């Protein structure tokens, strides 16, 4: 009986510590990998990754969250090439010389 209880407690502990990231279907594999690393390294409690259509391609904006006023969001293309950074202390609003406000929001692909 003691062995059964010990096994059940171990199983409950293992299953409760395993947390699968809920990433939207269709997200490129390299972006999924970046999200996994981003989730582990995030220092804000509310990071997220949003998908946009911008300059004839899909891009992914990695937003650190709201715990700092001057945090920059990194923009990647679907092959994980950095397109640029938005915001930050300099308040950048352009990627490749074009205002990012022309981007079309598609969806949030991951949120902590």
Describe each PLM feature range.
Residues 14-17:
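C-terminal motif of bacterial Sec signal peptides marking the signal peptidase cleavage site
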Residues 2-8:
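Sec-dependent signal peptide recognition
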